[in-house]
Amino acid sequence: MRFSSIFKIIILNIFISKMAHAAVCEERYPADSEECQYVQELEQKAEQGDESAQFSLGSWYAEGRYVKPDYKLAIKWLEKAGKQGSDFSYFILGYHYNYGENFPLSRQKALEWYRKAAELGDSSTQEILGDAYMYGDGFPQNTQLALEWYRKAASPTNDAGVVRGQGSASSAQFKLGVMYAHGQGVPQDYQQTAILMRKAAENMYYPAQLYLGVAYFYGEGVPQDYRQAVYWLNEGIPGSYTPGHIPLNALYDKAHPADRVHSQTWYRKTAQRVMAKVQYNFGVWYYNGYHLLKDHNLALEWYRRAAAQGLAEAQDAIGVMFMQGEGVSQDYQQALAWYRKAARQGLAAAQTHLGIMSAFGRGVAQSDRQAIAWYRKAAKQDFAKAQYQLGVAYSTGRGVPENSRNALKWYLKAAEQGFTPAQSALGEIYAHGRQGVPKDNKQAYIWYYMASMYTEKSKDDCSALIAERNRLKGTLTPDQLSETYAAFNLIWRKIDQSKEAKKIARKKY
């Protein structure tokens, strides 16, 4: 009798387990489908302790692949895989918490999981922790702990190539080099900076190549050598490398094999021509905190160096800093003066900024008509921000007659260049059926998803964007989601080919 009861319990548990497996999958696929059978087989392997099965199953619950997204089940299986040594399992948990992808958005929980991956030796999460301590993002700012994690990530054992999220050990080597250059947590040491930059530069990390080129130009940590400066600056200029690319110094040596008298003069002049763009790049990095710790004073210093050589982008950047009072006291007249210098050279960004100044009457008489004139000049150059501003103008009827079709046209042009505010605007239009278009949750989800990938909004705004994206996802069937992802990929390919997307890619590098 007792044996019979135990047997019944065992049979009942097996039945409940099978029903649970089916229920999990039936929300997406028929119970007798290959997909559901695959999920059941994988879960059985995972229950038996198979690390690979635990990782795959956890990833599917995190992503909503084959099964309904369930972050609690994702944690269950990925943590089991992590305990068996799968650092990537912990990385995935950190990633989903960090970006709110089917998980509650939580920087603190993301860092907890990233730390587990880092302690297992994952270089990308070691660098993420270094950044968190360096910038005080999720942890109290602590340069000593930042150094500790950067050193682990920069270890030669991590030099094999590209790793998750950050690039390679080269990125951490670069950050360590900058800390030595500025004496952050360590005594200032330009020679150590040069050593670290060379390691990263030789691994094709372009920020380090540029930094090393500047070091050779000024003789900081290395002997002054214009030939080496030209070589590394040329290697590091984003987009300069093409198949069959030959450095400028090699071209000079080939053309003048015996001429060494004038070589340093030639290299110096060549380096000077390149230097303005490099100085501007450093300004951008300091301004935004890309590759370097955010510092508006240092950003302004580098921008001024480049602007003194007539670089329009640097002139516009200084205008932005005066406009917003970053690193300097807010001064609309100074902003206008710098914008006009850049706009005279035809820079679309400066033309757009002059349009915004006119629209809001900052430093000049308010004029919607003048604003539209500046926006049109910049939009003719395919400048996404100007296209977006024209979309806003046609949407609200400021400076032009209100026109829903034109508003949608300009928003779409900007969005397809990767401009986040335009993508967000399209998401809202399709989600609520505005601007004369019918409500379309698939299109709304696509554009909100795009916007959430590279948003520069505040954390609160970003959370709202992600929440709306996830809400829309929940309204779509599996077939609709498949169609939506296919459409997303087509649009993304367009964006990836645009100039704006290249800027985003360099920013994220």
Go through each PLM region and give its residues.
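Short helix-capping/linker turns of helical repeat alpha-solenoids
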Residues: 47-50, 63-65, 70, 83-86, ...
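Bacterial N-terminal signal peptides
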Residues: 8-18
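Canonical positions in the second alpha-helix
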Residues: 43-45, 80-81, 116-117, 152-153, ...
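Hydrophobic face of amphipathic alpha-helices that form TPR/SEL1-like repeat modules
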Residues: 24-25, 56-63, 67, 92-99, ...
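Structural signature of tandem alpha-helical TPR/SEL1-like repeats
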Residues: 32-39, 68-77, 104-113, 140-149, ...
